[in-house]
């Protein structure tokens, strides 16, 4: 990459999965900071994980693998979900901004994942889970109220990361960088050091 050096990785959610793979394959970064990395998906109830694997595996080779995965929504989450029950942020202003971006620029809208995407993601997360952690300084942040990614996978990965540090943010939901100001500040301060 022809960018000023040194390089640092900051990655959120699925970006955390992609970023971890890139680091494992030699991305030349000095350190990494992960925000609620998707190293596993939180299924509720947990038995849904079995169904997700089975259905996405069966649908993957078919032409319908590009269809929205069963149980996923075609309307973007921040448009159909109200603030009180959302799983992304406790900051009403930040949550409103997320939805407003999509209303102003509809081309930014994403629906739920396709069955093919879900299957590829599940496979990649399992492959990464089986690998040792990189020899690289890292920070990882997750909230106690996380409902999108699998917290156990994060805890397991960071316990195996010799020069890694996990910060668990009390009450925080999935969007650490769009959470209440004191949580955002904690993330940006530690990441910037």
Briefly describe each language-model feature range.
Residues 14, 18-109:
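Alpha/beta-hydrolase-fold enzymes
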Residues 11-16, 143:
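Conserved alpha/beta-hydrolase "nucleophile elbow" surrounding the catalytic nucleophile
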Residues 165, 170-193:
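Catalytic active-site module of serine/aspartate enzymes centered on a nucleophile-bearing elbow/loop
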Residues 147-153:
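Conserved alpha/beta-hydrolase "acid-adjacent" motif
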Residues 109-131:
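Active-site nucleophile elbow and catalytic-triad environment of alpha/beta-hydrolase enzymes
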Residues 134, 140-142:
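Short beta-strand/loop motif that positions the catalytic acidic residue
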């Amino acid at each position: 990459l022809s960018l000023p050096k040194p390089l640092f990785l900051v990655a959120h959610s699925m970006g955390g999965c992609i970023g971890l793979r890139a680091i494992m394959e030699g991305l030349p970064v000095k350190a990494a900071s992960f925000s609620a990395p998707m190293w596993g998906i939180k299924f509720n109830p947990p038995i849904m994980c079995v169904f997700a694997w089975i259905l996405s595996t069966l649908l993957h080779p078919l032409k319908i693998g590009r269809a929205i995965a069963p149980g996923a929504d075609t309307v973007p989450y921040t448009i159909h979900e109200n603030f009180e029950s959302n799983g992304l942020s406790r900051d009403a202003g930040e949550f409103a901004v997320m939805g407003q971006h999509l209303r102003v620029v509809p081309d930014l809208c994403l629906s739920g994942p396709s069955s093919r995407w879900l299957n590829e993601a599940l496979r990649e997360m399992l492959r990464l889970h089986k690998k040792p952690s990189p020899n690289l300084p890292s920070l990882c942040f997750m909230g106690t109220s996380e409902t999108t990614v699998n917290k156990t996978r994060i805890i397991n990965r960071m316990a195996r990361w010799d020069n890694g540090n996990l910060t668990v943010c009390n009450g925080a939901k999935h969007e650490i960088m769009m959470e209440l100001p004191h949580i955002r500040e904690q993330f940006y301060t530690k990441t910037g050091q």
